[in-house]
Amino acid sequence: LSSEKKNIIKKFSKKYNLPISIIAPYKKKHPMVSKFSLFSKKLATKNNTVNLLLNSGPLREHIADLSLQDNFPLIASSANLSQRGTKYRVKDIETRVKRCADIIINYGPCEIYKEGKTFDHNGLSLSSTQIDFRDMSIVRKGVYFKEIYNIFKDEFDINLALRL
């Protein structure tokens, strides 16, 4: 990504505590990427991009910091079956998914769940808003979509294109 786009990501993530997924190209020779097995790399990348979740809460941020400090890559799942909606509490995770886990940390419901922001007007479970930084397009509308869209428009003068 250009330095301008990197600065937008840094400024957004520091100034606003809104969960957002950034889709961006990755450096194939990056030390973290080079540690992936072929299987892991296939799971963690798509079309030469990675999807990084930012502002995902204190526990996940701390684990990510430890990962960076130790130069040990982590790949995380959404803890749900495909097309079954994001789970915000351990008790809502499907049993089939729980059986696959080596460890489950019940850190309690996240803030957006407590705020009642996890469902859209149709009652469907929302996840993070995904933005593809290659072309500044919305790949998925998620929690706080309107706020995120307006921040990019007002603060960064970027009209995010809807690719849905």
Model-derived features with residue positions:
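Active-site-adjacent structural elements in enzyme catalytic cores
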Residues: 1-164
